[in-house]
């Protein structure tokens, strides 16, 4: 399919659709007064509340779903749990809620972990671990190759490729000298 043909067909069609009412997200018909969404929501919600349902016509009178605050449901006024000792002239708050006593200032005994069988000090374990790591690092295969890459300015493999191609650091060019 030719892309120019597709563009020339679909572009006018899209322009026509977007200029008509059907192409918009919320089309407003001509002559219709536009109300904001919040006003529409308020109007709809009041209509739903005021219109009785068929099942409610013979039933009990309408009661709101959310209970109103009564004297029984009101929480008690805020009372601090521990009175402050900063100002002694202030009268104590009314005792609507019982006060929680302060914790004692005595501290418990310090925690001593139970002794382990064959327990060694940590320093001995650290030294043994260091020795083990050092031995394994010294014996690792290919360690010498990694630390000394070769005589060239790159690695061994790149130096070999450079020597063969005549473009490496250690390559001798015999073509220029005659």
Swiss-Prot record:
In terms of superkingdom, the source organism counts as Eukaryota
Q: Which GO terms describe its cellular component?
A: cytoplasm; extracellular space
Q: Where in the cell is it found?
A: Secreted
Give the transmembrane region(s): none
Which GO molecular function entries does the Swiss-Prot or TrEMBL record give? Answer: hormone activity; hormone receptor binding; toxin activity
- Quote the tissue specificity entry: Expressed by the venom gland.
* Leader peptide range in chain numbering: 1-25
Instruction: Give the keywords, sorted.
Output: Bradykinin receptor impairing toxin, Cleavage on pair of basic residues, Disulfide bond, G-protein coupled receptor impairing toxin, Hypotensive agent, Secreted, Signal, Toxin, Vasoactive
Q: Which InterPro entries match?
A: Natr_peptide, Natr_peptide_CS, Natriuretic_peptide, Natriuretic_peptide_brain
Renumbered residue ranges of the record's region Disordered = 69-107, 135-155
Work out whether the entry's keyword set contains Disulfide bond. yes
Keyword Ribonucleoprotein recorded: no
Question: What are the cysteine partners in each disulfide bond?
Answer: 153-169
One Gene Ontology biological process:
cGMP-mediated signaling
* Maturation propeptide residues: 26-58, 69-73, 85-89, 103-112, 123-146
Q: Which PANTHER family match?
A: ATRIAL NATRIURETIC FACTOR PRECURSOR, NATRIURETIC PEPTIDES B
* Function statement: Helokinestatins antagonize the vasodilatory actions of bradykinin at the B2 bradykinin receptor (BDKRB2), with helokinestatin-1 being the most potent antagonist.
Protein family membership = In the C-terminal section; belongs to the natriuretic peptide family.
Identification of the protein by name: Natriuretic and helokinestatin peptides
Provenance organism? Heloderma suspectum cinctum (Banded Gila monster)
């Amino acid at each position: 399919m030719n892309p120019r043909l597709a563009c020339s067909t679909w572009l006018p069609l899209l322009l026509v659709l977007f200029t008509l009412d059907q192409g918009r997200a919320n089309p407003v018909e001509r002559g219709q007064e536009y109300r904001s969404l919040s006003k529409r929501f308020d109007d709809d919600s009041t209509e739903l509340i005021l219109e009785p349902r068929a099942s409610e016509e013979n039933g009990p009178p309408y009661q709101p779903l959310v209970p109103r605050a009564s004297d029984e449901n009101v929480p008690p006024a805020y009372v601090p749990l521990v009175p402050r000792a900063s100002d002694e002239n202030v009268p104590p708050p009314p005792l609507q809620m019982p006060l929680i006593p302060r914790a004692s200032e005595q501290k418990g005994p310090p925690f001593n972990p139970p002794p382990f069988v064959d327990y060694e000090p940590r320093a001995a374990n650290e030294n043994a671990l260091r020795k083990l790591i050092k031995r394994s690092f010294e014996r690792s295969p290919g360690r010498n190759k990694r630390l000394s890459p070769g005589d060239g300015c790159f690695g061994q493999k790149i130096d070999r490729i450079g020597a063969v191609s005549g473009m490496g650091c250690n390559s001798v060019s015999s073509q220029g000298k005659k």
